[in-house]
């Protein structure tokens, strides 16, 4: 079993992520991400756009079980994070969460 919090911190340290719903939706549209993570309580229109464009681009989406506040806290941010895109997983195994290709 992959520990989400551990792997998220690992990808933040060794890989490349982009935080924010607008940037994640943009990367879903252009196919520039390997995985998109969305908070459980993200606005419905944001989730709908992310799932729609990610499906078109073949990008896996992982729905984080916690809230956007908890996701922000895991990332060490003092604000909410509704969505983030993993561009480079680095040394983490975070792509295994959503069945993405490593």
Swiss-Prot record:
GO cellular component, one term: cytosolic large ribosomal subunit
Keywords, sorted A to Z: Ribonucleoprotein, Ribosomal protein
GO annotation terms (biological process): translation
Pfam families documented for this protein: Ribosomal_L7Ae (PF01248)
Listed Gene3D superfamilies: 3.30.1330.30
GO molecular function, one term: RNA binding
Record-stated family: Belongs to the eukaryotic ribosomal protein eL30 family.
Assembly description: Part of the 50S ribosomal subunit.
Family annotation (PANTHER family): RIBOSOMAL PROTEIN L30 (PTHR11449)
Full protein name: Large ribosomal subunit protein eL30
